[in-house]
Structures are given as structure tokens and as C-alpha cells.
Amino acid sequence: MRITTFQQLEEICLKRNKNIYEVMMTSETHSGENTEYHTRLQATRSLFAMNNAINTGLKSTEPSISGMSGDNCAKLQENFGKNKSLFTPTLQKIMTYALAISEENVRMGTIVACPTAGSCGIVPSVIISYAQDNNISQDEQINALITAGAIGKIVALKLPLAGAVGGCQAECGVASAMASGALTQMRGGNVSQIINSVGLALKNILGLTCDPVCGLVEIPCIKRNAFLAIHAVTASELAMADIVSMIPTDEIVDAMAQTAQLMSPLLKESAKGGLAKTKTAIELERNKSMV
């Protein structure tokens, strides 16, 4: 049984009265892709690595090799410590963790690509922050990770999850949808709400370009992880209120794939357009080449 659409996934879950992670594990077992044991083992290892990346990133101000980043997480932590934020403690944690992991990535630390290295801070920051503040067990976090993986897997059947093919909508955008679905599940949302949250997250980042300054996964990638982690929470919040996307999730994925085809190659990880060709970016590139 190969699951290729969100509609098919929802129908199977409802028919069998199963959760998304249960259906996807069964599907992979039947197809010979993986056993339930190995799926959960891989998710457990990923969760361990994600926590390590957070803990390391929170303590470090070491600059990246380029010198363009490395202290964003520390600055945010310092500002949150002044108790002037509009965000709740959990939202503060989500933003901070997203930056911590993303900065670990540019320091060449160990991260989990979920679905890509450039979007590595979004899924773990949302899952782990919510889990820590709401007594969510490790098993439930693993279930959430498997659900997030299922979401990414279905999207990837229509559009490769790479900035060079689909722009950043296919990286940070899909990561945000994965995080939103995982969060909605942890909050007790039903299958329809989970899939709706995916659609809500995706349709509001359509056309997001991949235009890395100096061709490095730093500017705007690191800060974008923090923004789209909060975007995931917004999608979950709307879905939990039963605010339904008028465009079905599968059609949104189709629109994303079409948008990727229409997008100029200059805006798909080439560093030849968008932010990468601003005056300041060109100057940074020039200075970098002189080092």
C-alpha cells in the first residue's frame, strides 16, 4: 500500500481509526521500505541528535566559517531575558531553538536535515519546545517526528525538497508544514486538522525564493528558520480552531510544484538573484573572496 496523497492518507486513517504515524509505519513495513522497529529507532536517534544540537547551540557564540553569523541565538536569549517580549515562553523557546540549531549547522556541527540542512531548525524547535513545556513523552515526540516525516514524504512525491529545484518553499516551507502537522498532532488534533494545518502552512509560503548570500546557508536561512517555526505554530493554531483552507492540501502541493517550475533558476539556490544580488550581498561576496 503506497500512500501518495494527503486525501488518501486521511481516508485510510479515518477508515482504520488510526493515527498518521501508525498508518505510515504500516505502509513502510508492507512495502519493505522499513520495519516499525527501525522506523522508531531512526526517529529516536534523530530526536537525540536534535536535542544535542539545541543544547550545543544555546551555549555557543562561535562564529561560522564565513564570520557572517554565530551570535543570533545568544542575542535573542539575552533579549528574552529582559522580559519585554510579546511572545509566550514556549514561543520564545521555539524561536531560540530554531536559531540554535541553524547556527550549529553553519558551524559544521551535527544536525538532522528535516527535510534539509538549510531548514534544520524548524521541525525540532517546534516539537521539542512544545514537548518540554507540556510534559510530552519521548514516545509522543517520536510519533510526531514520524508524522512530520510522512508529510515531507508525500510532498516530495510531487516536488523534490531542494532549494535548487523548488526554491525555499520546498525547504523551509515544507519544514514548516511538517512542524505544523507534528505540533497539531501533539496538541490532540485529529487527522483532518493535521492535514489542514499542512495546507495552511504551505499555501502561505508559496513562491518563497532560495537566494543565499555568498551561496552559503546563512543569510537569510538562519533567521528564516526562526520565522517559519513560528509560521508553523500559526498554521496549527488556525487548524485547531477548525479554520479550514478552501484549497485542499493536495491541490496546494500541486500549486507549489507548478510555482517551482515557473520560478526563475536565478531564484533557486544559484545565488544569482534576490537577496544574493543586493549591493550589500555583493560586497560581502567580494570581501569573502579576498580572505
PLM regions with names:
Residues 37-49, 63, 89, 93-96, ...:
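Conserved active-site and cofactor/substrate-binding residues in soluble primary-metabolism enzymes
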Residues 124-135, 183-188:
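Alpha-helical support elements that line or immediately flank enzyme active sites
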Residues 86, 113-120, 132, 136-137, ...:
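Glycine- and small hydrophobic-enriched segments that form the cores of compact globular domains
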Residues 181, 185-291:
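Functionally critical mobile loop/hinge segments
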Residues 145, 151-164, 169-178:
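Glycine- and acidic-residue-rich phosphate-binding/metal-coordinating active-site segment common to enzymes
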Residues 1-109, 133, 242, 249-291:
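Generic N-terminal targeting/processing segments that precede catalytic cores or assembly contacts
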Residues 108-126, 170-175:
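Conserved phosphate/anionic-ligand binding catalytic regions in large, soluble enzymes, centered on
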Residues 88-105, 140-159, 204-212, 267:
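Acidic-glycine-rich active-site phosphate/pyrophosphate-binding loop
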